[in-house]
Amino acid sequence: MFVVSFALSILYYFAAKSNDRTQQFLRGNVSILPKRKGRFGPRERAPAAPLRAMPAERLFFRRGSAIMNVRRGVPRARCRRTPCGGETDPRAARVPKNMDINKYDPKFKLRRRDLLGLTDLTSEEIFELLYAAKAMKKKFRMRENSTLLRGKTVALLFGNASTRTRVSFEMGIRQMSGDYIYLSKDETQLSRGESLKDTAAMLGRYGLSAVVLRSLTETQTHEFASYSDIPVINGITEVSHPLQILSDLFTIWEVKGRLDNLKLAYIGDGNNIANSLIMGCSKVNMDVAIASPHGYSPARSVVERAMQYGDVLITDDIAAAVHDADVVYTDVFISMNEEDDEEKKHILSRYRVTPEVMALAKPDAVFMHCMPVHRGEEVAAEVVDGPQSICYDQAENRLHVNKAALALLVK
């Protein structure tokens, strides 16, 4: 008994002395709990008995289980995944047996009215949107306008600065023979405290056919949709950016010729882009690896849900994430309204994508950035302006994906 107690004391001592990569595993779930706004944080324990503690290189989620890959040949610790709650739409948990988009037979239909997030979409619905975007791009290249929105008017309710989202929607609606009205949140009664319920219910009474929101939080966007009689499209929230990631998947499909059995590595802040990439990539059978500093990793709830569909790697090690990647992706370090966060800038500064980082990926890997780009901060100019960059293709495809969403949602 004394020997056992002494051994446990030694184990506890070295676990406590280990570096920031020390992670705790708990029976039935991972003990890494949110440090900032529901994100994974280091050395934070859930109220349960620990299985073991060890220096870890990365945290790897593989379809329903969590695996800690450790250094120096230490065996991996496995835990069963704990149920993390239901999907907004139960059908979203269904993954088609054939995950090859090139073998999918599109119907060009969606069974839903709104597009609020990738968590809600089934894999088939993602494929439907991507095939519709492909058709829209073909018409665009042939300079053929569509009449799908003739007699329709779409409201763009925006609350912050926008270039790609606003221009792509305005031009897309025009190219589909529709009309739009641009509403700045500050110029509506929402800025003076009018309820979301009243605003959402009222807009449908004026003959609008859909509303694109880029002004509300994730919770407010879902609340708005619950009161609206017309389709609601999430342009962006602090938690998700579904249209951007649909555009990214479409771009990868174009460049790589497939989506399944690829690996995407995201480097930087675990923000709304990272959250949506995890969900979107997992649902099309694409592995995704996220390299973020502790306290800035993606939302835990998103990672747990994505475990139902595919493999997710969460790490603070850039090399581990980028190794053998087909796509390397990053986003701005500082989001809107965070410009004065000097601590965040300092912490993320070593997560810059450089030519040396790109060299760790596959030779034919491509670089992606959702823009705007801050050269010298999150990415070196040689990378974003180099031959591996497909950022402008990515940006153009926002137009075609937005048109696809409108075509399938607006009746």
Give, region by region, the residue ranges found by the protein language model.
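A hydrophobic, multi-pass inner-membrane permease signature
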Residues: M1-L26
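Rossmann-like adenosine-cofactor binding region
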Residues: M307-E382
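Positively charged, low-complexity intrinsically disordered leader regions
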Residues: M99-V167, M171
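Adenosine-phosphate binding glycine-rich loop
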Residues: D364-A365, M371-K411
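Glycine-rich phosphate/diphosphate-binding loop of Rossmann-like nucleotide-binding domains
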Residues: G159-M171, K256-T330
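Intrinsic, low-complexity polybasic segments
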Residues: S9, N29-S31, F40-P50, M54-P55, ...
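Phosphate/diphosphate ligand-binding glycine-rich loop within oxidoreductases
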Residues: R141-R143, T147-W253, R375
